[in-house]
Amino acid sequence: EILIGLVGSEMCIRDSLNFSEENQLLCSDMSFDALFEPDPEHPYESMARRLLGNTFNGPMSRRADKIAEMALKLHANGVVFFCHWGCKNTIGGAGLVRDRLEQEGIPMLTLDGDGCDRRNINDGQMRTRLEAFLELLEERRRAR
């Protein structure tokens, strides 16, 4: 079984991984922005801590470190990084995240597309690139 971490929108790869017996999508970085238990006695402080701890607030290096941390913690075989067209943050940060993951020996696939309008995504091309990446991950897994 190949374990995949995801950065950004999953809509570009959902169909390829749904109900797959060979591959499993572990998580999206959008869901682990600030993992801590809120204090019900101090809801506003808890909200502030969550906002300040969000990986989207601050430098991309912090987000890259968190992505690497979660990929290691969840034993991901690879990471798919979705870059939304026109988003300077994700496009500019993709290389930084790739470099950080390479330090840990985790390969990354970058997919570019429109995260807002699915009609602007070439599903066939994305599926082909994802399948090639999954084959690479499978070869790496067998070689170990």
Set out the residue ranges of the language-model regions.
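Single conserved hydrophobic/aromatic residue that forms the stacking wall/gate
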Residues: 1-8, 12-15
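Charged, low-complexity surface segments at secondary-structure and domain boundaries
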Residues: 12, 34, 114-118
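Hydrophobic alpha/beta core scaffold segments
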Residues: 18-22, 27, 40-46, 50, ...
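Small-residue-rich helix-loop
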Residues: 28-36
